Amino acid sequence: MEEFQGYFELDRSRQHDFLYPLLFREYIYALAHDHGLKKSILFENAGYDNKSSSIIVKRLITRMYQQNPLIFSANDSIQNPFFGQNKNFYSQIISEGFAVIVEIPFSLRLVSSLERKEIAKSHKLRAIHSIFPFLEDKFSHLDYVSDVLIPYHIHLEILVQTLRYWVNDASSLHLLRFFLHEYWNSLITQKNHITIFSKGNPRLFLFLYNSHICEYEYFFLFLRNQSSHLRSTSSGIFFERIYFYVKIEHFVKVFFDNDFQCILWFFKDPFMHYVRYQGKSILASKDTPLLMKKWKYYLVNLWQYHFYVWFQPGRIDINQLCKYSLYFLGYRSSVRLNSSVVRSQMLENSFLINNAMKKFETIVPIIPLIGSLSKANFCDTLGHPISKPTRADSSDSDIIDRFLRISRNLSHYHSGSSKKKSLYRVKYILRLSCVKTLARKHKKTVRTFLKRLGSEFLEEFLTEEEVVLSLIFPRTYSTSRRLYRGRIWYLDITSINDLVNYE
């Protein structure tokens, strides 16, 4: 038992004690401006002097600790138009600066970890598409799968407790706790859940959520490694490379019962596989569903008794892979049985042998994707292309390049689809929407403008991947065409496409 407790011990010597004074350093907000605020009003507002950012932060923190932090005097609004902004903007300023500071302990640990293990940073940053070759290789040999939505109703104190193991600065933690309680309501939607992965979410909350999820995953992987005769190999796939540097290598100290080894014995399963992206995870296993049920209740107990999150066991379904379609990262994946009959002739006797082989299929679901295109005003809810309003000073080449770029990104992201029919329809919607947009700008009919563009315009939308593959295989046109019709995984994609993120 001491062995397990030592495994979870935290290296207190690496705690950082003096992070609070960094809130008033100018370069911190330069970093925050670079990574998060970008072209925000903080650095572009008229009359704002970037040398006085620390003064502004001091005023904001002082007013936060007051009873009514949003009551500003008329003189403040006149002297500094910065205070005329809304409450969400104040929270963004502090959260962006605070996020840079709390990431310092993790970034230093990353550097020391990479130097100790002699691992290149690029090995830690895998592409999103690398998940699918893994699923393609493993899932055809597995039988049961669970699609788990990780609970996100996290109490504020749990998020603060996670940072306490890394930061021993009482002032910083007190400010963080006060800040979370003050601005938490701005992150709650009408459906009463936290939109963790929305674009407008501050970098700080993404960092806190990621660190919380990593703590859960370390408990999970620890139990997985202890319960299996085979050591699992894991590779990190970081969807917020700016926001979070590396998974924590140490665990929170926990206390186990005397029957811990007995509990582990019930979970022995060398064929358990785990994949996660954002708030969704997949558990897959071989043989009977009994072991999957045990892991299911283990996860429920872990969330309820350690993280204090109520999680109903009924939300985790155990399904057979051959009868279930898994929706993950914009693809609908499934394992299908392909039957083939082979006739064997031996002398005067002949035999018919029925071979059933499992095949991993990935299909692009067209209905959700059309809904995403409809929200972006490329088509209506039925998938009929419509013209998109543009600026009057936009040139025709800029409009065409924009549509081509969107089409190219979607084509690359969905290049792993087993069937290309849905992808062709998406290209058709974007192509016709581009033509209608140009016709609307020049006040001409679609037919007239399409004749003006000619057939070359159609080829740019329809045969881009085929041209690229023909350059790779210049002498074997049939090979490139066959590859174009098949699945292609691009290992340079590190973030999910905006039009795909419609879950």
UniProtKB/Swiss-Prot annotation:
GO CC term (a single one): chloroplast
Could you say which protein family the record assigns here?
Belongs to the intron maturase 2 family. MatK subfamily.
Q: Which GO terms describe its molecular function?
A: RNA binding
Superkingdom, natural source: Eukaryota
Task: Say what the protein does.
Answer: Usually encoded in the trnK tRNA gene intron. Probably assists in splicing its own and other chloroplast group II introns.
What is the source species?
Answer: Eucalyptus globulus (Tasmanian blue gum)
UniProt keyword annotations, A-Z: Chloroplast, mRNA processing, Plastid, RNA-binding, tRNA processing
Q: Pfam families attached here?
A: Intron_maturas2, MatK_N
Q: What is this protein called?
A: Maturase K
InterPro entries, sorted: Domain_X (IPR024937), Maturase_MatK (IPR002866), Maturase_MatK_N (IPR024942)
Locations listed in the record: Plastid, Chloroplast
Its BP terms in the Gene Ontology are: mRNA processing; RNA splicing; tRNA processing
